[in-house]
Amino acid sequence: MTMLWLAVLLTCGAPAALLPTSGVGCPARCDPSSCSPAPTNCQSGETALRCGCCSVCAAAENERCGEGPEDPLCASGLRCVRNGGVTRCQCPSNQPVCGSDGKTYSSLCRLQAESKAVQGRGVAAIIPIQRGDCQQGQKDPDSPRYKYNFIADVVEKIAPAVVHIELFRILPFFKREVPAASGSGFIVSEDGLILTNAHVVTNKHRLKVERSDGSTYDAQIIDVDEKADIALIKIKAKGKLPVLLLGRSEELRPGEFVVAIGSPFSLQNTVTTGIVSTAQRGGKELGLRNSDMDYIQTDAIINYGNSGGPLVNLDGEVVGINTLKVTAGISFAIPSDKIRKFMAESHNRQSTGQGTKKKKYLGIRMMSLSQGKLKELKEQVKDFPENTSGAYIVEVLPDTPAEEAGLKEGDIIISISGKTVTSSSEVSEAIKKEGTLQMVIRRGNEDIPISVTPKEIEF
């Protein structure tokens, strides 16, 4: 018995102690004839006396329970606990719980007691459906959900500074605006400077920016670096805006967690996560011969419309701009070190008042088919054509010469004006130098001739 009491004390702690359910003072034999009449309408149900002989109404929560042979036991689910010299029935859990009747109960035991009572009146049983208050739920800082949901912590921190960008064009015949495309961006200054991809804002008449709180603004293009695919736009807002700061992409490690956030298909703050495959995927590996930039490769999904959104580390710092999805599990981001350089150069350009530039624009995003990239694509894409070279079209932007000519995502440009294409840089040069381009593209196992004329636009 001494060991039993010691175990009880160690389990429950002082000064409270669980009482034994049987023991000293009980008769050797039960004599039912000595029991009082069986109880009826017990709100907490029936139970036997501590000696297990006569039936009595069970003690409800906070009611006194027995130390002696003639004292009642607690109702099912309750424990008889001595605390400060008084023994009462207590619920093992004192956390509130929400019932199926929409009411909040102080404990699960209280809900169960009420359920028994209403069932006795022919009403449906009340079941627990949620921990905590019906209106607020339960917030437990020590639960795994709060302790280990680091991705949610990052998203909560950065989401207010991520914006949705909607792009409009004018229909010449009807003389009215229609939505043309959408993308993402993030605020980098309290007075409204926003970073995004250059291809997001190219060839559009008007930009509308929507913040996570639903407020909308017209935006103005401030600066564009087409080669780096970075653009700076600006909105005019009242008051200071939340901003995101740049991290150092050079410090990224393969295997590090990253979070991509944006607004694909106009869905605000869509979040994907992944790891860094490499922080230094050279542009030349992607077939961008004129590129001196190393891209961040990640398996975080970057969908259409996610372009221009931030890729952040677990500290909530921007380590890249989401820019390119080749296929599932292979996406690329412009590193923050390149963004930092663009911002400095843009500041200098604005200070010196450099004017706008003109360029030819086709409306595709592409990459060269190196041997390594061919192998990756054949593993990822079913029925990938048996090509050894060419420019692989990753994306065709809406309302562009490329779309109007019939180019599609997944097409491979294999020749222009009769000359074999071996890299995306050759296509870029042809766009700059030639007028109408006579292309042959491979779609599946079919070679298709397509004629497309680039459009000249201002930046």
From Swiss-Prot:
PROSITE patterns associated with the record: IGFBP_N_2, KAZAL_2, PDZ
Induction: Up-regulated by FGF4 and FGF8.
One Pfam assignment: IGFBP
Keyword field contains Transmembrane: no
Annotated site location: Involved in trimer stabilization: 148, 150, 257
Subcellular location: Cell membrane; Secreted; Cytoplasm, Cytosol
Designated name of the protein: Serine protease HTRA1
Gene from which this protein is expressed: htra1
